[in-house]
Amino acid sequence: KSSMITEDSMSGVRVVYPTHRNEEQMGILLRAPEPDDRAIRFVLDSWCKTVAAEPPWNFGSTRHTPPPPHPLLIYEHDTILKKIIHKSTITLACDPDDPDTVWGYVCSDGELLHFIYVKSAFRGFGIGGCLLRSAGIPKGKMMISHRTESLFTAFPNIRFYWNPYRMIYGT
C-alpha cells in the first residue's frame, strides 16, 4: 500500500485519514492549540517526562557520572520548552468527536523538528506519520533538536540530524 492522506477540510482544522496503517479509517482531527488550551499543559508534561525517561545525551554512551535526577531534568526542561513553544508551530492530533481529547502532537519550527509524541494507546495507527507530514518538514535528512530512542524506533527510515543547540538557543 502507498502512504497517503485524504482530507476533509473544516474551518481552520482538518480531519485526516492516514490510509497506509489505519485499516479502520479512523479519522484524526488536526488542529492548533489555543493559547489557554489545556492541551499546552499536556504537551509540556508529556515532553518533559519523555526527555527525563530518555535523555537525549544519554544513549550510546557509557555512564561515568550518574544522570541528573528526574525532578531536575523535568524542571529545567520545562523552562526550555516554555521558550521553544512560543516560537514554534504545534499541531495536535485529536479525536474528531471530541477536540479536547489529544492523541498526540508535533512541535516544529520551519524545517526543524523539535518533538513528536503519540500516546502509547494510539501508536501504530499512522498518527505519528500523519503529524510529521502535517509539519511540512522535507523528507530525507531531518534536523531535530530533541532525540529520543522512541523517535528512532518510530521512524527507522528517516535520517535524523541532531542539533541540541537549537533546543537551547532556538532558531
Each PLM stretch: what is its role?
Residues 1-9:
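Short, Lys/Arg-enriched N-terminal segments with co-localized hydrophobic residues
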Residues 8-74:
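Short amphipathic alpha-helix that is part of the acyltransferase structural core
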Residues 22-24, 96-101:
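Short, solvent-exposed loop/turn segments that connect beta-strands within catalytic domains
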Residues 33, 116-121:
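Hydrophobic adenine-recognition pocket in adenosine-nucleotide-binding enzymes
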Residues 61-90, 95-97:
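Active-site rim helix/loop that mediates acceptor-substrate recognition in acyltransferases
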Residues 92, 99-117:
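Conserved beta-strand in the GNAT
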Residues 121-138:
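Conserved acetyl-CoA-binding loop-helix of GNAT-fold acetyltransferases
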Residues 137-167:
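Conserved GNAT acetyl-CoA-binding A-motif
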